[in-house]
Amino acid sequence: MVKRMFCLNALMPAVAFFGVLTLRADSVSFVSVDTTSVAGTSGFLDFTFDPGPFLTQNAFASVAAFSTDGAVGAPAVSGDVTGTLPPSIILNNDTPFNDYFTAFTFGDTLSFTLTLGGPAVDSPDGVAASGSTFAFSMFAGDGSTPVLTTDTLDGFAFTVDISLDGTTKLTNFSDPTSVESAVSAVPEPATGWLCGVGMALLISLRRYYSAVMPR
């Protein structure tokens, strides 16, 4: 009985060790918009990614795999934004206003993959006092009248907020817009190494337990 209790007690730290491991991954969403109701009209698409008013941890928003049967025009870019649509752009929250505003002739559909990542998502520091927000909007030809959304104040089709703990919150104002979340299963390198060490520890303890316990 003493040997049994010793082995069980030895296993407990390893079990606890595994219990506190968490996998951190970027937030990935697949976005598609049914634009048939405004097909053939001229307008604009707007992508923004801005930090909050207080101390904000670094993060980025990637818009990739952009596809449409409409036509993309020339963009107006503000802040820390790189790339061109199509195929992809990256917006960083390094400046107060980061915006990619592009002319667009609507077709029947448009789609893209949205990825939110960086330290604010992967490794929150507990020091930041504000999160960051990604927003996607569609406007009519005057550049200010929202289309395909119930948000007539700001014109957002949807927003995704990054919270202080690295989680994300979606708010969708647009019935024709589908935003489906997908979770990446790739752990941080350090986490993968710790998992390997923990597994080896459990195997060793199990072998020891089998050796010392009477059959």
Language-model features: where?
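Extreme N-termini of proteins with methionine-enriched Sec-type signal peptides or N-terminal signal-anchor
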Residues: 1-2, 213
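Generic marker of residues within folded, mature protein domains
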Residues: 15, 21-23, 37, 102-104, ...
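N-terminal segment immediately downstream of the Sec signal-peptide cleavage site
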Residues: 25-72, 177-185
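Generic "edge-of-domain/loop-turn" microfeature
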Residues: 38-40, 54-56, 119-121, 143, ...
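C-terminal membrane-anchoring or membrane-association module
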Residues: 203-215
